């Protein structure tokens, strides 16, 4: 059973609000729900082009439901700053917290482990602690903490599709280890302090205004410059690509259904905790994905019609920390929230290519 939450007239904290997923979520909520106040937090770091984050954040500020004021306030800051987080929670009574702030990137974590520990573990701990203290003095407290995990926690899992019931005790990257740590910490806080927590394992998110370090975006940048793109594991990689609108739809449905608070037969609280995959459920071979991407880039006018694709592809070995396949079993999400991702690769890449053409024309 889930405790139903109506998003109208709610105070919501979204961390990572200028990030790919955070901005798309913020804009969707502001356009569809009345009386909502969103506090968006982001450190706006330079892991990738800060101008893209500014672009997303401007879209956050302008997003609104017709006839209603925009209820968005932006705070530039790092959730690893405990004083900042504590002050936010003291100033605002949050009904729902969505923690999307994190240092992303599997390969980047190999050479920069410190920033992952700071943001993904210390930062998340600060959020958990702040949520815990919203219950002080018998107050109602945060009704639901939703946080981002990742498909990377599955590591080299041989069983497909990946289920949340599968053991994930052997991460192959530091990024994955921090995300698994988030799940463990959230479960502990749900058990000890009865905080309703739901973790979401996202599978290879793509779409307009995405992260330039993601394969589809970086490949587009390189192709546009006439450079060669590397396709890992000699093309024998499959990814469960999931379009951003499907990810956001999944998050919004989950936000509105918190794990129920109840007691077990021993009279002790059962942790109000849940974990779901959000993935398309249709792994795509990278070579096929690239072919579709190139076709849509030509269609959008990003690449010329006579572009020599084969001259700009190079098959290379698997990279450290990478895995050959990701494949989501999202039946739990369908069972509990009635939702399954629906947007196919060609439709999603077409929307990305059209956005890319418009964005870089605007930037020129």
Say what each PLM segment does.
Residues 16, 20, 169, 173, ...:
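Amphipathic alpha-helical recognition patches that constitute DNA-binding helices
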Residues 1-205, 292, 359-362:
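N-terminal Rossmann-like NAD(P)+-binding domain of SDR-like oxidoreductases, especially those catalyzing
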